[in-house]
Amino acid sequence: MKHIHLYSIIVLLLSSPAFAQKTTYLSKCGDQQETIVWQEKKTNGKIYLYVTQENEQHEYVMNKSFQTEKWKVTNIQLQTDLTIELRNNIYSLTGKFKGKSIAKTIKSNGYVWYQNIAYNAGVLLKDKKTVKHECFRPDNIKLYAMVAEAQGMEQFMGTNTNKIEVCLTGLLSAFWTCSYYFNPETLSFVGYKGVNGKPGTPETIIKIIK
């Protein structure tokens, strides 16, 4: 009986949302191929998402409404170790970015901060058509206002998914857009299509593999 009781406790603990759940994706851009690993856990009313892609690690801290409160990006090869936190509509940036020291503040544009829209757009747009938000562009750490818009059902890699398009706002909307794909039942992220670079850059395609 003791063994059965202990086994039940272990199963309960491992199934608890406080423990990390792991998801792996494959990213392809031209001839380049990389693995992306997501690990998430929920504890003390916070959501923690850890993302690893090659030499780069991202840590996101979100509240129950999926609003980003903190984002940390680390890449030793690029001499980057930067933390951004939001308090009272003011972003605090501290650390190093591409070898340059940063210690400054930036005022929010007044939108909700969703630094990793792939994580939560499926849930956010379940009963909405559009969601405005803001995020920092990872390659230059500039703050942009964005719009995510539900596009309905669409096939992605042979599977029915909920498609969501994300673009810049205003006049900039004509210059960049990308597509995210979500499982219609779990609302979890399963894929991405978009050009992440200058004109002529091959399209990046991300798909879930396990």
Predicted regions and their residues:
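Acidic, serine/threonine-rich low-complexity disordered tracts
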Residues: 22-23, 28-88, 133-210
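Sec/Tat signal peptide C-region and signal peptidase I cleavage site
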Residues: 16-20
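Positively charged n-region of N-terminal signal peptides that target proteins for export
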Residues: 1-6
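Surface-exposed beta-loop interaction hotspot
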Residues: 96-135
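Bacterial N-terminal signal peptides
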Residues: 7-15
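Low-complexity, intrinsically disordered regions enriched in charged/polar residues
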Residues: 8, 30, 111-115, 200
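An exposed acidic His-Trp-rich patch
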Residues: 81-103
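Short, charge-rich amphipathic segments
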Residues: 21-24, 56-58, 106-120, 142
